[in-house]
Amino acid sequence: MALEDFERPVIAAVRTMFLTSRAAARHMIRQGSGVIMAFGGYGDPIPGYYLGGLQVAFQAIDALRRNLACELGPHGIRVVTLQTGGVPETIPEGFDGREAIVDDIVRRTMLGRAATLDDVGNVAAFAASDRARTMTATALNITCGAQVD
């Protein structure tokens, strides 16, 4: 794998998370509250998958989330990550190998199903609400049991 191919997802993920968080934090600091929400992969690299820099990018986002939570917490800003383990609805119909990917996502879960976009939205709404006001510097595992924390 070429270096450029490996580092592309790492640079894109960290840069996007940093720039978006910085822009949001400027407003949130003024109001004394807010929630920055990231999306990422989960756990350790998956044997048998050759994802190049993608898993490294997920781990970098996880580290950045913890760092931002430490820096922004004193301003009343919470930072959380949603970890899904894959949402089959987001894989385009007709994508080469889609069926095998979806089957594998579901096979890895304890519940025999994968998270849906509705599931992700419901967890995101909760995480952004005052009901989750004690949660920061953490990842919310919505992998249907594919990842054991």
For the regions a language model picked out, list residue spans one by one.
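Short C-terminal tail/terminal secondary-structure segment
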Residues: 125, 136-149
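Substrate-binding pocket helix/loop in short-chain dehydrogenase/reductase
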Residues: 1-7, 93, 101-105
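Catalytic loop of short-chain dehydrogenase/reductase
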Residues: 35-61, 65-74, 86-87
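Alpha-helical segment proximal to the catalytic Tyr-Lys
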Residues: 26, 70-71, 133
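Catalytic Tyr-X3-Lys loop
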Residues: 2-19, 37, 54, 61, ...
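A conserved structural motif in NAD(P)-dependent oxidoreductases
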Residues: 109-120
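A short, exposed helix-loop element centered on a Lys and neighboring polar residues
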Residues: 21-22, 66
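Short, small/polar-rich loop/turn modules that mediate ligand/substrate recognition or access, typified
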Residues: 73, 78, 135-137
